[in-house]
Amino acid sequence: MSDLHMEFAENSRYIKHNEFPVTGDVLVLAGDTFYLNNTVAPLSKFWKWASANYRQVLIVPGNHEYYQFCDVMERGLQWKWMLKDNVGIYQNQVVCIDNTDFILSTLWSNIPAQDEYWYYQSLHLSVRGFLKGAQASVNDKDVRVLYGVW
């Protein structure tokens, strides 16, 4: 499963009032769950439900986890953050469950220097369009982090 986007109120309400069908022992959430610097989202009742219904919950950060001025390198290149005993967010980790290796890593693009301006403009245009003309809260550093331009 991916793209829960718990940072959006409508999605959080839906998740709060609707349970997902349990379809296995391990739940993998492949990105875009909540902003990593959000102090409320990790306390969501969803994690209690997931912990009770799955043997293991493996969360991999996507690009949206690093929005809202969360520095991609703040935690380093390899880390894990346990929300519950069996619910964790993993970056550049391998978790072995029953002889199956789960390789948990955010994949970033390597944008050639000559294309940096095009990606920069595209991100700003898409964010402004999404916000319907409102001032976007994206700075130059965010653009470089999101698109892997260093």
PLM regions and their residue ranges:
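N-terminal active-site segment of His-dependent metallophosphoesterases
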Residues: M1-I59, E65-E74
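Short acidic low-complexity segments
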Residues: F20-T23, G88-I97
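Glycine/small-residue-rich loop that forms an oxyanion/phosphate-binding "nest" at active or ligand-binding sites
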Residues: D71-Y90
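Active-site-proximal loop/helix segment associated with metal-binding centers of metalloenzymes
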Residues: I103-W150
